[in-house]
Amino acid sequence: MRYALLIRQDENAAISAQERSRRATGLAAFQAGMRARGALTGGEQLQPAETATTVQCWDGGDMVIAGGPLGGTKEQIAGFLVVDCKDLDDAIGVATRIPAAWYGTVEVRPVRETGAS
């Protein structure tokens, strides 16, 4: 079963260039291991939240378009991975090994299989 791992981070947290490099190296190693296992089926890093545009329309009303991400949290979605795991426990285990989980939040969500992909 496929799971989306939504990686959330505080984009305003100050980190050194050395720490940024350490994190990038850790993510690359994690992704290489997942590819070798045949479990990484997709994913991308996202541009900063300030580049987001939010589109909302409730109950068929007027469309509201706003610059920026949906508010309410200091952590923003920084990227996502799509992994193929045997079950939720396996996906949670994978999420705990993502370096971003050590300094942010990883939301694990099953992918709805529609047959369209």
Listing of model-derived features with the role each one plays in the protein:
Residues 1-117:
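Conserved, structured core segments of small domains
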